[in-house]
């Protein structure tokens, strides 16, 4: 099956979106949180909180969702300016492993080759054997990656590793009304004193465990 579509440069597009929201006066702040309650201390008033922490919701106090688990994915970024076509091929029925080639728009001539799917693998580093298999599969689909000179001659730029936020039973999309500090002794004990006294009712939308969609 072939069709015409669009392809975007993911990192550049995210930077573009960040610039757009900042241009509209929206402030982007980064914080490391250990509990859901801490998020309500960042501003004097919050109408609604969206918990989209992915795998972080497994350890986030106040959520601690034990049904979350990772599915490690690995890709290889290569340089092949002559490759302009995307490829996507499932490695047999009943498997979640696909081999794919995605040219990344931009002057660098970069192409993304993938992929892998390893359940319950928390390792943050790239597996050389998986990388080799990815390059071999990619070359089989598109010899132009090295202008027909073999997979060993594909110009590798970098290796990427990510962990898909999988969840038993599917994603969680839920509106929760809760009171600060209601989540039990462990969460409550770790809350700073002044904020723990604030037990106001708050609203949170949980949106995580989206799995292969990231």
Describe each PLM feature range.
Residues 2-34, 40-48, 52, 57-59:
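Helical element adjacent to the flavin cofactor pocket in flavoenzyme catalytic cores
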Residues 6, 10, 127, 131, ...:
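Aromatic-acidic/polar surface patches that form glycan- and anion
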Residues 36-136, 140-158:
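Flavin-dependent oxidoreductases
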Residues 4-6, 105-106, 210-211:
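Short, flexible beta-strand-to-coil junctions
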